[in-house]
A protein has these predicted regions:
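Charge-rich, solvent-exposed alpha-helical interaction surfaces
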Residues: 11, 15, 28, 32, ...
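Acidic, low-complexity, intrinsically disordered interaction modules
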Residues: 42-104
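Intrinsically disordered, low-complexity segments enriched in Ser/Pro/Gly/Ala and basic residues
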Residues: 4, 29, 44, 65, ...
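Negatively charged, low-complexity tracts enriched in Asp/Glu with abundant Ser/Thr
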Residues: 2-36, 121
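Intrinsically disordered, low-complexity regions
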Residues: 3, 106-107, 113-121
Length: 123
């Protein structure tokens, strides 16, 4: 039959994840990073680092070292989520359940896009 076995699917997903690169993650998040003035990705001598700026204190308040593309993806997903929460609520209230669901879909879509790009590069 033409159906892919669960084992083959798991192996394929694992291979696609292994092909995830920092460049793919940065490409997928480029539009977001261009819009968010508070977070930057900096290439240090040790590797990529995601830095968050606190505009009220006028200082960097978060620094996440990302030794792997998966770490970079996780850090940027968190930064994106915080950015969107502020965009949606203005920082004045909690997200509604509907807004939380929408944000979860956006996160899933960004993750899926990274996986799709990684799969393209590995084939």
């Amino acid at each position: 039959s033409n159906l892919i076995s669960e084992r083959d699917l798991t192996a394929w997903k694992g291979a696609a994840e292994r092909m995830l690169t920092n460049e793919i993650v940065l490409k997928v998040f480029s539009d977001y990073l261009a819009r968010d003035d508070d977070f930057e990705v900096v290439l240090t001598s040790k590797g990529y680092t995601v830095m968050g700026f606190d505009c009220y204190r006028q200082d960097w308040n978060t620094v996440y070292f990302c030794p792997t593309p998966e770490d970079l993806l996780d850090s940027l997903l968190d930064a994106y989520e915080n950015f969107r929460m502020m965009e949606i609520t203005g920082g004045d209230r909690d997200l509604t359940e509907k807004e939380e669901a929408k944000l979860a879909k956006e996160r899933d879509a960004l993750t899926a896009l990274c996986e799709k790009e990684a799969a393209k590069c590995s084939s």
